[in-house]
């Protein structure tokens, strides 16, 4: 057990380093866009090409995680990310930036299924929620710390954060090669008999509703998260520091919740009920954000709504990991794919609605998240999962 805890610590440290690199470039990306005189449409397509590439590659990467191993896929993903950030740092043309973002999408498609499958192999059904909560917290913490460091580095040179991000990813890849050993497949992740083969597995009853909820919730969450900064800027006149305080505050509270409460909540409620309650919380608060006006009220609602998001995401990942048996890579790849679909189309639809009325993207998010709540009411855990808990 101690050996597995050390392995988990190494894995989460490498994941933190990778997402620290992602966070580094957040403050300086608009500066690069202004330097190259890119339009809002070009930036939107650039964001979409990351998600589309991740969408296309995720199913393949998921299969490869099961076929070739967890460690090699994580390392490949980190190397792709390192190259992606380096190219963005040296990029002087739109074409180079698009290539960079596409490589970034490939890296995400490899890393996340590999990490979740790795964790499934070194944990038991009972200890997995805590480990996946730690995984989400490591990602959140990287996003929290990264922008602050990136803003400091950008004072030296606007391209420096991208080179540091590339170096961090390369460091994480080297550490993974040197310190991680390919895990033995967990005997608890038994083969589930009688399931559909190939992509027909998407429509298997134990997966289908989970994937639908991932898709629908990703639509709602992406439309909310991608336009939150514009919303509070246009509606309330918030400054960049105000927005940073709210997002950082939400991320900190969310990370603490994932570490301290997520494991307890999954034991008390189970994943399906926790997903439902998180969706109810998020749906209510996204709508409430369109009605509040005071700074303190907006701050409290924003911080709390991110807690709902940060509980739902690892709950879905934990549920999929528990039901997937020996198909951990497949489940992780599909999770990534359906999330990517939402990340592609949610911001596009939200952006169109924002041009009509600043509140409309949040109404749209409220409706889509409410559909997710309705789906959870009909959602039942498969028999083999009930038997194991």
Curated annotation (Swiss-Prot):
Location(s) in or outside the cell: Cell membrane
State the superkingdom: Bacteria
Question: What is the protein's membrane topology class?
Answer: Multi-pass membrane protein
Q: Which InterPro entries match?
A: MFS (IPR011701), MFS_dom (IPR020846), MFS_trans_sf (IPR036259), Sugar_transporter_CS (IPR005829), Tet-R_TetA/multi-R_MdtG-like (IPR001958)
Gene3D superfamilies linked to this entry: MFS general substrate transporter like domains
| Coiled-coil ranges per UniProt | none
Record GO biological process: response to antibiotic
Give any GO molecular function from the UniProt entry. transmembrane transporter activity
Family listed: Belongs to the major facilitator superfamily. TCR/Tet family.
What protein am I looking at?
Multidrug resistance protein 1
